[in-house]
């Protein structure tokens, strides 16, 4: 089915989305249920690196450019810190990484005006949103009933995302965030 012919209210890539989603959910559930904390930590590392790279790419489209190497180091250190020392290590690493970005932007960059430092806000938001929140999966895994809690969290995320997708396709009229996703309603 071509992009122009809309004979159904769902998109032409629904099959691809369903297949890739089922594979990802299967890997996630098996990893959470049967994997060690280190294995889950490795998966979290991959997800955080990919997520932070996607966040960086979205910022690049808005003319906010981040140092690629520093961004990858930030993702790596934030992801492995729960394996090294739990929540304390994760929080300490967030402070160190955020402090490093602040120092870099305020001292070592050539930005002269306060308006030029808006990228720092986006960096700190991304570090917290992606880099700090996802490694908590590793910490939750070690809690009593942690595997069950993470599986339930995964089910809630999949259901809300799916319902939002189908609701947007069925009832959506007004475009939302066209700069990020031109067809999102």
Where is each model-derived feature located?
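Membrane-embedded alpha-helical bundles of polytopic integral membrane proteins
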Residues: 2-185
